[in-house]
Structure formats: structure tokens, C-alpha cells
Amino acid sequence: MEEIQQQTQKEEQKHREEEEEEEEGPPPGWESAVLPPPIVTITAAVNPNPTTVEIPEKAQMVCGSCRRLLSYLRGSKHVKCSSCQTVNLVLEANQVGQVNCNNCKLLLMYPYGAPAVRCSSCNSVTDISENNKRPPWSEQQGPLKSLSSLRRAEN
């Protein structure tokens, strides 16, 4: 009887140890949120005055081929998708126009100067004319505020 109790206790202890060893990671597909870049202060022995270095800000876009969300350094002209290897052209806000699809009325974005745009939803082609153009995205949103100007406004 005593042997059975000892064996049961050993099995329970082994089971507890196995549970403690198992680490549950994040669920599949989970990615951490992108945080704004920190401002780094560098102090050198030669220069006792600290120097503030601004780390480049990140931006996001959707891959034109596989529709994955891509993060890149602001100011980049091209971004290569790590999933499908497509090189995407990065357009600034003042280089992008918007128009509603003639067929399904989906809001489409296109590079300024394009004569027409194909809808990614219904595949119809919408001609870009003066009567169906919207103002550039940058004009709709107003001037772009940098992260540093937002920090100054908070203080």
C-alpha cells in the first residue's frame, strides 16, 4: 500500500514538473505591436554634452501582390515583401490619387498621372477623369505631423 502511495506521489510530482517546463507562447499569427522609435541619447567621454539621435520612423503599406502588411523605414522608395519577394514601389501621400470604382464603388488608390485603374475586387477598369478624382490623400488629412512634433505638443 505504501509503495502505491509513493508511486502516485512521484507521478504527481513528475506531472507538475512537466507542466512547469511547458511554456505557452503567443498564438499562431500573433505579432507584437509596432511601437514608435525611441529617442536615443549618446554621451561620449570626449563630448560631455549629450547628443540626441533620432532613429528613423517606420511606416506601413500593403504588398501589392499578396496583400500582407509590410513595415519599412519612412523615406524608402522600394520595399521588398518577405513573403512573396515582390518589390513594391512606395508612393508618398502627395503622389497618390483616389477614385471610386465605376462598377462596385470600392474606393481605389492609384499613382497620380495614371490614365486608368483596375479594381482589385471586381477587376473592372475605371478611367481617371477630372469629374471622378478626389483630392490627394495628403490634402484630405492635412499636413503630416512628425513624431517629434507630437512629442513637443504633449510637453
Swiss-Prot record:
Cellular compartment(s): Nucleus
GO biological process: response to bacterium
Cited function: Putative zinc finger that may be involved in programmed cell death and defense response.
Organism in which the protein naturally occurs: Arabidopsis thaliana (Mouse-ear cress)
UniProt region (Disordered), positions on chain: 1-35, 130-155
Stored InterPro entries: LSD1-like, Znf_LSD1
Name used for this protein in its record: Protein LOL2
Pfam families associated with the record: zf-LSD1
Keywords: Acetylation, Nucleus
